[in-house]
Curated annotation (Swiss-Prot):
Residues 419-430 have a biased composition (Basic residues). The gene is KKQ8. ATP binds at V455, G456, H457, G458, A459, Y460, G461, V462, V463, K493. It is found in: Cytoplasm. Gene3D superfamilies: Transferase(Phosphotransferase) domain 1. InterPro entries: Kinase-like_dom_sf, Prot_kinase_dom, Ser/Thr_kinase_AS. The keyword Kinase applies. This is Probable serine/threonine-protein kinase KKQ8. Residues 14-25 have a biased composition (Low complexity). It holds the Pfam family Pkinase. GO terms for cellular component: cytosol. Residues 94-120, 140-165, 214-223 have a biased composition (Polar residues).
Length: 766
């Protein structure tokens, strides 16, 4: 027999290896480490693994480069330092002083689960702004995912081929090395995410419900298989016990938050009582009235004192009588939309084009109520309009026309209402120059239903919840608000000028709040793409006499402030670290979207952050937002003056003679919001030197020691993730804004890259 045929025969005898079996099992053509094909033979998501070589030793070509980091680089972390002479920080509590004490050691994870196992300790860190700390890039050991709840390793972890004798077995039962799927493709993320959705029929827009079972395409095939292993016939990965529709092991089960062994989590926030019961008081489910969002204490005797806020959808919930609700319906009955439309339909959320503004050619068309838009294209080419140089800006030509349109209608409506103030005959008459009543236009109740509750009070009016019966036309993809199995809900904010407010000032505020919110929440609707999931959807603007009505998406879990206060009162603790990290990432993503389109919020605080029961976060209240770059501007323009609520205001805002970047102000405010989530109280009341002793202490320690004792004493579920978070906090809280980290870079830090979020952002355009 020729030599080459003998070698071939010998190779055939050795072909009964598990490598061939694995190729048959997963229908992979080649075995080159992780498979590039799914279980059905179609290309699956790429498994990105960063392989590094230690050039110091060629013999360790495939050995991970490991840098050991001491368990505690700073001995002061072992024992909290107590600073004498400082005011009691508990005075900054969001809750009464007689509430349960706050836990300083962080929320426990599980009695039988090691906290060190919950977060992978791998990372490639960004530049550390603290010169006293070691900011070298470190890589940790890649530990297999074990059955006791350890999380998978990060995709950037330095790993080498596994030559152990049981590596194939570990792959089959799911305990082998599997890449951490944070920020993977959306399809890959969804396949790996085990979902515990809302009760049947409930839906929150922007939240993608993943399938029950994870994907099989993530199981890698190996070329270094063992010899002589018996193998079964070809089966699908779904038939393996690991990939059956068996939910993952829950390692942390709280009333409001669940954590699973693969690292994903589920929020189970309470729904308002007003949503659980209809106007007749018929309960739709068994939610408790003491759901943690109602009847917040208020007063001067150590109880909750909110920062000044225009509105809150859940903060001051009070039950209202049927008579109050009937009066509200009577007022809303005559409300007329101020938005010009090219088409009227009976169901507002079933057609996206319904809310696309139709901009008229001249102001005479606006005053006459004409909806003629045939010359829109010609108007866009008008030489009097500056050339658009920033197509990503949220405020462009159409928004400018809508601003002029609404401002004119609001001014005329208020002027006419003032003249008819004492005329009883004008009680149910729409003011001249405002929205023109049309017998073909559907009534308010047909579009948004009837009032079921009054859930908020503010300086300019009240916030109500309206609901109507859900029908087959209310398809989920087009709907921009909350619904259950029977009804669809809308938040309705009434805005009425105070006697001391000039008409021009009130008109500017309404127009600014509506235009910014509407343009951001509908930015991608023009192109038929998915909109930003963390921006509250603004739907319509209507008028009745001197009252203006803004219709918005309804978030039935209330605002973040109410959640923090209720949690502190009920269990005496702030949010779980992983829960707060998820909210932090969503908040950063939402503000990143705003900044990418030329808008800074300038008033970020828990009262302006709304929540859905599944944990989906929504940013609201754009009344004080700053448009720092329009479609006609190439460069960012700064601003001056104090904006926002005191505990969240950045230090540079207190200098009236100096301009500041509003984007960096938002970053500072986000840091305060996060610390409030994990500590249960503000860091300080005022970030101006000489006005607050706590801020003075922070400033002096940062200047002398490059650290702040409050940040040093914070604890997370894992020492490494705690270190990464601490680095990010120091980058956020830079008193000098020129040294402060941006939102984009903050999302690239190791802390945020390790944070698993409820919303898959990979395929959502920025």
């Amino acid at each position: 027999m020729p030599e080459h045929e003998e070698r071939h025969s010998h190779g055939v005898n050795r072909s009964l290896s598990l490598g061939s079996s694995m190729r048959s099992l997963f229908k992979s053509q080649r075995s080159r480490g992780p498979s590039d094909r799914g279980a059905n033979g179609t290309p699956g998501p790429a498994q990105k693994v960063d392989i590094r070589v230690d050039t110091a030793s060629a013999s360790r070509e495939h050995t991970p480069v490991v840098h050991k980091t001491p368990q505690s680089a700073n001995p002061e972390l072992q024992q909290p330092r107590h600073h004498l002479g400082l005011p009691n920080i508990l005075k900054l509590n969001l809750t009464p002083t007689n509430s349960n004490p706050q836990s300083k050691s962080g929320s426990p994870v599980s009695q039988n689960t090691s906290q060190e196992s919950l977060i992978t300790d791998t990372d490639i860190e960004v530049e550390d702004y603290r010169p006293s700390k070691d900011s070298r890039r470190t890589v940790r050991n890649a530990s297999p995912m074990s059955s006791n709840g350890n999380l998978p390793i990060n995709a950037n972890t330095v790993i080498g081929p596994d030559t152990s004798s049981n590596n194939i077995d570990s792959m089959l039962d799911g305990t082998g090395l599997r890449p951490f799927y944070e920020e993977a493709d959306s399809s890959d993320y969804i396949e790996n995410l085990r979902s515990f959705p809302l009760p049947t029929g409930h839906y929150a827009p922007g939240f993608i419900q993943p399938p029950k079972s994870p994907t099989s395409s993530r199981v890698p095939s190996r070329s270094n298989s063992r010899k002589g292993r018996e193998h079964a016939g070809t089966v699908s990965a779904a038939q393996l016990p690991r990939y059956n529709e068996t939910p993952g092991k829950c390692i942390l089960d709280l009333e409001y938050f669940k954590l699973y062994e693969d690292g994903h989590h589920v929020h189970t926030l309470k729904v308002m009582t007003s949503v659980n019961s209809d106007a007749n008081g018929n309960s739709h489910n068994h939610a408790s009235k003491n759901d943690g969002h109602l009847d917040l204490p208020k007063g001067d005797d150590g109880s909750v004192v909110r920062q000044k806020s225009k509105f809150s959808l859940s903060g001051f919930f009070k039950p209202h009588s049927k008579e109050d609700i009937a009066n509200a319906d009577e007022k809303l009955k005559y409300a007329v939309s101020l938005l010009p439309r090219n088409k009227i339909c009976s169901k507002v959320e079933t057609d996206r084009d319904t809310f696309a503004p139709v901009f008229t050619k001249t102001r005479s068309h606006v005053q006459s109520g004409s909806d003629d838009s045939s010359d829109d294209d010609e108007e866009l080419d008008d030489p009097s309009i500056p050339k658009i140089v920033n197509k990503n800006a949220a405020v462009g030509s159409q928004e400018l026309k809508l601003i002029n349109n609404l401002s004119e209608k609001i001014r005329m409506g208020l002027s006419t209402a003032a003249k008819n103030k004492h005329n009883q005959s004008s009680k149910h008459r729409t003011p001249s120059g405002a929205g023109v009543q049309d017998e073909n236009q559907p009534a308010f109740a047909d579009l948004y239903g009837k009032c079921v509750a009054v859930v908020g009070h503010g300086a300019y009016g009240v916030v109500k919840v309206c609901a109507r019966t859900r029908d087959e036309k209310d398809d989920l993809p087009a709907t921009k608000t909350y619904m259950d199995s029977k009804k669809i809900y809308f938040a309705v904010k009434e805005l009425k000028p105070r006697p001391s407010d000039p008409i021009e000032k009130f008109s500017t505020r309404i127009t600014s709040e509506f235009i910014i919110g509407h343009s951001l929440s509908h930015y991608y609707d023009k192109n038929g793409e998915q909109s930003a999931p963390n921006i509250l959807s603004i739907i319509d603007l209507l008028e009745y006499n001197d009252t203006f009505i803004e219709v918005m998406e309804f978030c039935p879990a209330g605002d973040l402030y109410s959640l923090l206060t209720a949690r502190k009162n009920k269990i005496g603790k702030p949010l779980h670290p992983l829960e707060a990290d998820c909210f932090m990432k969503q908040l950063l993503k939402g503000i990143q979207f705003m900044h990418d389109h030329g808008v800074a919020h300038c008033d970020l605080k828990p009262e302006n952050i709304l929540l859905h029961p599944n944990g989906l976060l929504k940013i609201c209240d754009f009344g004080t937002s700053c448009v720092f770059q329009t479609a006609w501007e190439r460069h960012v323009h700064f601003q001056t003056g104090l904006q926002g609520s005191e505990p969240y205001v950045a230090p540079e805002e207190y200098n009236p003679k100096k301009e500041y970047d509003p984007r960096l102000v938002d970053c500072w405010s986000i840091g305060i919001v996060y610390c409030t989530m994990i500590m249960g109280h503000y860091l300080w009341r005022n970030a101006a030197r000489g006005k607050d002793s706590l801020y003075d202490s922070f400033y002096e320690e940062m200047a002398s020691k490059k650290e702040f004792y409050v940040f040093e004493e914070l604890r997370h579920i894992n020492q490494e993730i705690n270190r990464l978070r601490r680095i990010a906090l120091y980058q956020i809280f830079q008193p000098n804004p020129e040294k402060r980290i941006s939102i984009d870079k903050l999302l690239q830090t190791g802390w945020m890259r390790h944070t698993k979020c409820c919303v898959p952002y990979k395929n959502i355009p920025r």
